[in-house]
């Protein structure tokens, strides 16, 4: 891969003045070889990946130093724990969780993801055991993450899985609930937690990369002062191309040094609580005074289309979620607009129709009850099914009332407690079973 002198200078400016970084380099590794009906045997087999994780951590640090690029997090995704718990006892899931947490800490891995299950049409022993142990698994670890895929365009939506999930997250503190999500159509190669897991059909081990560049897009728009929407689209597209090329360079270098496959650059624009690193701020730079105002959806649609076209030109290894993230707490401007009243749950659902964020990193007051949260999650997963999109809900139940917030610090930012509608939905949420797949399923063959 060759780079022109002009391109190198531009990237240098992006790195030093516009907060461009690599959000995550994620090692995705098959761990199914360690499945056994004896916990001790499983743990002993899993020990084989320790040296691999140690090499990965060292190589990522070396690549970051070599290119002068800030790599924010090192992450690992493993095969879904559901498959281990098909043959192990329920309580063994906690021991697996604690072991994965220890091995991540030992090797300076920020997150290890894969305490996950697929239950979009019903439960197996393993998927139900993951759900039942989710509270303890997260409460007894610090780096473990995982998700429940409770809906898909192919299969429909498992309402019973949503109910159990809500019961579990109401029992865990905010920091722990930030490490789990419930999703529709989850991809097999996401570099982001908590959706990351080593999916079916993936190679034995592979590298997936997530980039972060909202500040770069914002600066490009401000510099260029576009006069037409076509010019605006083109500016974003060109900036996205350069951001993606950086992700490709880092991912391929790490993979080559490890002697494994490079699979995915996730094109998602991932914000952070830092000033100047906000997706919402891009929308406001495009001309919407406050995100949430009318026109926000159209502006986000332009942003998404341009990012995807620019990114797809820069790499043939597109994967993961590849859209914009608008996690409320992790985006400083989104958080402020939520407190000001410009962003509510239905605004987030509307914006999710053109991006892959869903309801992400938003607080709900426990005092408003579980039924409304179940209804909210079913809304966002239904949108994912109907549009055949990757969507999810990462909701943070909090004891505080709507309108308040708590600050988790770091990448997690300020959790705003949004008000749920004061409407009784208990009759609807009392139904059991699953919502059948839609007519969209017939379009897939």
Swiss-Prot record:
Domain of life: Archaea
InterPro entries, per database record: UPF0210
CDD domains linked: RNR_PFL_like_DUF711
Positions in coiled-coil regions: none
SUPFAM superfamilies per record: PFL-like glycyl radical enzymes
HAMAP family: UPF0210 (MF_01221)
Similarity comment text for this entry: Belongs to the UPF0210 family.
Protein name: UPF0210 protein STK_02450
Species per Swiss-Prot/TrEMBL record: Sulfurisphaera tokodaii (strain DSM 16993 / JCM 10545 / NBRC 100140 / 7) (Sulfolobus tokodaii)
Organism lineage string: Archaea, Thermoproteota, Thermoprotei, Sulfolobales, Sulfolobaceae
């Amino acid at each position: 891969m060759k780079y022109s002198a002009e391109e190198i200078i531009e990237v240098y400016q992006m790195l030093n003045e516009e907060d461009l970084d690599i959000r995550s380099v994620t090692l995705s590794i098959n761990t199914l070889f360690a499945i056994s009906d004896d916990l001790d045997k499983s743990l002993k087999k899993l020990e084989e990946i320790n040296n691999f994780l140690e090499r990965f951590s060292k190589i990522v640090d070396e690549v970051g130093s070599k290119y002068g690029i800030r790599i924010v997090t090192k992450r690992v995704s493993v095969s879904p724990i559901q498959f281990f718990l098909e043959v192990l006892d329920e309580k063994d899931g906690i021991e697996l969780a604690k072991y994965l947490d220890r091995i991540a800490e030992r090797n300076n891995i920020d997150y290890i993801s894969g305490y996950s299950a697929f239950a979009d049409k019903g439960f197996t022993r393993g998927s139900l055991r993951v759900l039942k142990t989710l509270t303890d698994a997260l409460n007894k670890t610090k780096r473990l993450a995982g998700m429940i895929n409770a809906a898909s365009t192919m299969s429909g939506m498992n309402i019973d899985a949503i109910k159990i999930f809500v019961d579990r997250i109401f029992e865990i503190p905010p920091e722990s609930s930030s490490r789990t999500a419930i999703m529709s159509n989850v991809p097999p190669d996401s570099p982001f937690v908590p959706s990351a897991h080593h999916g079916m059909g993936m190679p034995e081990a592979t590298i997936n990369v997530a980039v972060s560049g909202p500040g770069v897009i914002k600066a490009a728009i401000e510099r260029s002062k576009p006069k037409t929407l076509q010019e605006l689209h083109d500016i974003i597209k060109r900036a996205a191309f350069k951001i993606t090329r950086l992700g490709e360079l880092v991912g391929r270098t790490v993979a080559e040094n490890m002697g494994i496959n490079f699979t995915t650059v996730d094109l998602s624009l991932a914000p952070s609580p830092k000033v100047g690193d906000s997706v919402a701020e891009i929308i406001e730079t495009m001309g919407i005074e406050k995100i949430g105002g009318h026109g926000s959806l159209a502006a986000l649609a332009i942003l998404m289309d341009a990012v995807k076209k620019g990114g797809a030109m820069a790499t043939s290894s597109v994967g993961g979620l590849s859209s914009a993230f608008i996690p409320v707490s992790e985006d400083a401007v989104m958080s402020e607009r939520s407190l000001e009243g410009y962003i509510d749950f239905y605004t987030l659902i509307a914006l999710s129709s053109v991006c892959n964020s869903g309801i992400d990193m938003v607080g709900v007051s426990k005092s408003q009850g579980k039924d409304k949260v179940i209804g909210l999650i079913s809304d966002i997963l239904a949108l994912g099914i109907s549009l055949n999109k990757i969507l999810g809900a990462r909701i943070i139940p909090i004891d505080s009332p709507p309108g308040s917030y708590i600050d988790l610090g770091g990448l997690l930012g300020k959790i705003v407690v949004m008000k749920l509608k004061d409407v009784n939905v208990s009759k609807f949420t009392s139904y059991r079973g699953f919502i059948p797949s839609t007519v969209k399923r017939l379009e897939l063959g």
